[in-house]
């Protein structure tokens, strides 16, 4: 008995494989007779669906398909499916409000990306607007109205970006929080600087005008002059030279000591102004 069951199962699998091969053969055979561009596009979409279904059948566990629902290849009547129904799996996630209501909820894990929306003005914290869609009927929510296209050009810049979850925005959020804290600290301090004393603005002006190196040299020179003014003034010492020996004068005591004959002729002046002959 078990042998008969195994043979029946193998025969059933072979029959299903033959049906799939026949379906694929019919689909490819019909593609030869097509001529218009609309039919070619429709056939390309059907071939893509067939390849996706075949890949899902051969894989052990398909994460895209619902559990327990077997996938079947399209039959010979699949060529008569209209183009709008054949391309239903490839509907973009970002739809206008009229079409977003007709589409069912998206599976969990689908990412929404607004990279193609170049007209929107976004802040520094959310440049890409990538978020994971939530499950439910409100998963495919339409885009918010663009204020920069309808209103004045500067109206959209003041809008705060919507909080979107995602690991790719953590760095941007940290940078935005740090810049916000820095702005709050600057706002709490009294504004003692004017617009001309702002170092960032002055640096930008110097870079644009090309006078950055000149300004740096001028500041270094002025700082050197300030340091020289703060130092005490000291007389400059001349160059060192050998001492010059001058001949001693005859009236000096050194000359008297050096010349014993002149010591008798030397006269000393006392405090009273009386000249006393030297001994």
Curated annotation (Swiss-Prot):
Keywords, ordered alphabetically: Cytoplasm, Phosphoprotein, Proto-oncogene, Wnt signaling pathway
Disulfide bonds: none
GO annotation terms (biological process): canonical Wnt signaling pathway; positive regulation of canonical Wnt signaling pathway; regulation of protein export from nucleus
GO CC terms, sorted: cytoplasm; cytosol; intracellular membrane-bounded organelle; nucleus
Superkingdom of origin organism: Eukaryota
Modified-residue entries (Phosphoserine), positions: 88, 249, 252
Transmembrane segments: none
Compositionally biased spans, kind Acidic residues: 7-24
Location of this chain's protein in the cell: Cytoplasm
Post-translational modification remark: Phosphorylated.
One Gene Ontology MF term: molecular function inhibitor activity
Region described as Disordered: 1-24, 56-76, 136-200, 228-279
One Pfam family per UniProt: GSK-3_bind
Chain residue ranges for the region called Involved in GSK-3 binding: 198-220
Family: Belongs to the GSK-3-binding protein family.
Cited PANTHER family: GBP PROTEIN, PROTO-ONCOGENE FRAT1
Subunit details: Binds DVL1. Binds GSK-3 and prevent GSK-3-dependent phosphorylation.
Reported function: Positively regulates the Wnt signaling pathway by stabilizing beta-catenin through the association with GSK-3. May play a role in tumor progression and collaborate with PIM1 and MYC in lymphomagenesis.
Name of the protein in question: Proto-oncogene FRAT1
Organism listed in the record: Homo sapiens (Human)
Source species taxonomy: Eukaryota, Metazoa, Chordata, Craniata, Vertebrata
């Amino acid at each position: 008995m078990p042998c008969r069951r195994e043979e029946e199962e193998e025969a059933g699998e072979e029959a299903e494989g033959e049906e799939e091969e026949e379906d694929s053969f019919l689909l490819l055979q019909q593609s030869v007779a097509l001529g218009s561009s609309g039919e070619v596009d429709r056939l390309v979409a059907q071939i893509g669906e067939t390849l996706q279904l075949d890949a899902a059948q051969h894989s052990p566990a398909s994460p895209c398909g619902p559990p327990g629902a077997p996938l079947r290849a399209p039959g010979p009547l699949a060529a008569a499916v209209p183009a709008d129904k054949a391309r239903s799996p490839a509907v973009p996630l970002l739809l206008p409000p009229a079409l977003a209501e007709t589409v069912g909820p998206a599976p969990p894990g689908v990412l929404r990306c607004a990279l193609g929306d170049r007209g929107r003005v976004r802040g520094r914290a959310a440049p890409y607007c990538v978020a994971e869609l939530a499950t439910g009927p409100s998963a495919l929510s339409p885009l918010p109205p663009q204020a920069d296209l309808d209103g004045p050009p500067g109206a959209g810049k003041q809008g705060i970006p919507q909080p979107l979850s995602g690991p790719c925005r953590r760095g941007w959020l940290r940078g935005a929080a740090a810049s916000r804290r820095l702005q709050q600290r600057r706002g709490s301090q009294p504004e003692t600087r004017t617009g001309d004393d702002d170092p960032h603005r002055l640096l930008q002006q110097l870079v644009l005008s090309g006078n950055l190196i000149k300004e740096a040299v001028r500041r270094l020179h002025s700082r050197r002059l300030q340091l020289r003014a703060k130092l005490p003034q000291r007389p400059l010492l001349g160059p060192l030279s050998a001492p010059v020996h001058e001949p001693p004068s005859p009236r000096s005591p050194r000359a008297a000591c050096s010349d014993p004959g002149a010591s008798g002729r030397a006269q000393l002046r006392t405090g009273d102004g009386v000249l006393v002959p030297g001994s």
